[in-house]
Curated annotation (Swiss-Prot):
Name of this protein: A-type ATP synthase subunit F
Keywords recorded for this protein, A-Z: ATP synthesis, Cell membrane, Hydrogen ion transport, Ion transport, Membrane, Transport
GO cellular component assignments: plasma membrane
Compartment(s) of residence: Cell membrane
InterPro entries reported for this sequence: ATPase_V1-cplx_f_g_su, ATPase_V1-cplx_fsu_bac/arc, ATPase_V1_fsu_sf
Organism: Methanospirillum hungatei JF-1 (strain ATCC 27890 / DSM 864 / NBRC 100397 / JF-1)
One GO molecular-function entry: proton-transporting ATPase activity, rotational mechanism
Lineage: Archaea, Methanobacteriati, Methanobacteriota, Stenosarchaea group, Methanomicrobia
Complex and partners: Has multiple subunits with at least A(3), B(3), C, D, E, F, H, I and proteolipid K(x).
A Pfam family: ATP-synt_F
């Protein structure tokens, strides 16, 4: 399983430096949506990282799909804007609560 990161060039820079190769620089809302669809179609990606402000710009139907997705598990970084916590997402994808 691979990790994919979608965001503006500043957001993805740190992930590139950490060695993540599937990074997508999306400078517009349309590009974010395009890359999200691309990642969802790629069966090799297990984790998708998005900036929470980009997640808020995604159309509601696609956002709901991402919030309920187990494969890939979607992690949003930045401001907490509702949705499931990282703990709940990990619990859903792994099947156990790792914090207990």
């Amino acid at each position: 399983m691979e990790i994919a990161v979608i965001g503006n060039s500043e957001f993805i820079l740190g992930f590139r430096l950490a060695g993540i190769t599937k990074t997508y620089a999306a400078e517009s809302d349309e590009k974010v949506v395009e890359y999200v669809h691309k990642v969802l179609d790629d069966g090799k990606i297990g984790i998708l990282v998005l900036n929470s402000s980009d997640m808020a710009k995604i159309p509601v139907r696609l956002r709901t799909t991402l919030e309920n997705s187990v494969h890939p598990t979607v992690i949003t970084l930045g401001e907490e804007e509702g949705g499931l916590s990282m703990r709940e997402r990990i619990k859903r994808s792994v099947g156990v609560d790792l914090w207990k």
